[in-house]
């Protein structure tokens, strides 16, 4: 697994705003947007591209276009704040969604949504989640992607803990991780220390979803057959974490409104 820690004064300044407990929700979202753009910039440095010929208002010129833009996969709910800036940098990118809450007693991941293309072989994927703490939710997400054939996976996070990096390395040894910081570890509540708190709460307010809420039902059989006949069509369903997924979860997440 390749881990890249962004070393840049602008990234460090935005990370400081995110860490500061005095930062309000609007300031937190703005700093997260800026830092996400920096992460996407670094993560796409070696993106495949092709040369094209264009015309300026003055003359012919050579240009560049991306080949096979990645699928963006935010982990709900905190990852939602990274989608807009990622799409601003990669306007051709499509977006899938994975929803994972956490049980506040056990810190185990509680999956409730997987809206992803059925086939991801040969397609690069960028997973967006501000916090990589225990790695339980990320391992679940990586498992969903791997079962759909994804092999080119990049994880973008603002802050990572060694425990989360270890979980990613165990689940997807060939994945790449781009982060603004690797902190020292987790506390007893499975939060990153020093971290930045609960990234979902700090963007959107307190999370009212609890792990006791029932999982979303499977789609009706007829709809499932229709989706299976259409390659690349997204399916939205609740999926359980794989048996190899770590059992802890760093923060809460909420289902979309």
From Swiss-Prot:
One term of GO molecular function: magnesium ion binding
Q: Which pathway is this protein assigned to?
A: Pyrimidine metabolism; UMP biosynthesis via salvage pathway; UMP from uracil: step 1/1
How the protein is activated or inhibited is described as: Allosterically activated by GTP.
Q: What is its EC number?
A: 2.4.2.9
Matching NCBIfam families, A to Z? PRK00129.1 (NF001097), upp (TIGR01091)
Q: Which domain of life is it from?
A: Bacteria
Co-factor note (free text): Binds 1 Mg(2+) ion per subunit. The magnesium is bound as Mg-PRPP.
Protein name per the record: Uracil phosphoribosyltransferase
Q: What does this protein do?
A: Catalyzes the conversion of uracil and 5-phospho-alpha-D-ribose 1-diphosphate (PRPP) to UMP and diphosphate.
Print the keywords alphabetically. Allosteric enzyme, Glycosyltransferase, GTP-binding, Magnesium, Nucleotide-binding, Transferase
Q: What Gene3D superfamilies is this protein classified in? A: 3.40.50.2020
Q: Write out the biased-composition intervals (Low complexity).
A: 211-230, 238-248
One of the GO BP terms on file: uracil salvage
Known catalytic reactions: UMP + diphosphate = 5-phospho-alpha-D-ribose 1-diphosphate + uracil
Binding, uracil = 192, 197-199
Q: Where is this region: Disordered?
A: 203-257
> Which family is this sequence assigned to?
Belongs to the UPRTase family.
Q: Which residues form a coiled coil?
A: none
To which species is this protein native?
Mycolicibacterium paratuberculosis (strain ATCC BAA-968 / K-10)
Which cofactor does this sequence's record say it needs?
Answer: Mg(2+)
For binding 5-phospho-alpha-D-ribose 1-diphosphate, which residues are annotated in this chain's numbering?
Answer: 77, 102, 129-137, 198
């Amino acid at each position: 697994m390749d881990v890249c820690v962004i070393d840049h004064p602008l990234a460090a300044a935005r990370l400081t705003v995110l860490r500061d407990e005095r930062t309000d929700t609007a300031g937190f979202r703005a700093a997260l947007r800026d830092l996400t753009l920096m992460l996407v910039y670094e993560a796409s440095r070696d993106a495949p591209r092709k040369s094209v010929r264009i015309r300026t208002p003055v003359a012919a010129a050579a240009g560049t276009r991306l080949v096979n833009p990645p699928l963006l996969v935010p982990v709900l709910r905190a990852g939602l704040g990274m989608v807009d800036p990622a799409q601003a940098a990669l306007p051709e990118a499509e977006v899938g969604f994975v929803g994972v809450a956490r049980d506040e007693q056990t810190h185990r991941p509680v999956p409730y949504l997987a809206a992803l293309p059925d086939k991801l072989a040969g397609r690069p994927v960028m997973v967006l989640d501000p916090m990589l703490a225990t790695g339980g939710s990320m391992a679940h997400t990586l498992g969903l992607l791997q079962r759909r054939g994804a092999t080119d996976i990049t994880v973008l996070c603002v802050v990572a803990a060694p425990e989360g990096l270890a979980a990613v390395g165990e689940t997807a040894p060939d994945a790449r991780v781009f982060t603004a910081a690797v902190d020292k570890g987790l506390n007893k509540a499975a939060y990153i220390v020093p971290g930045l708190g609960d990234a979902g709460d700090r963007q959107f307010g307190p999370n009212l979803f609890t792990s006791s809420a029932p999982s979303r039902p499977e789609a009706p059989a007829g709809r499932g057959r229709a989706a299976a006949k259409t390659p690349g069509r997204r399916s939205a369903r609740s999926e359980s974490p794989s048996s190899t997924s770590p059992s802890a979860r760093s923060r809460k997440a909420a289902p979309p409104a």
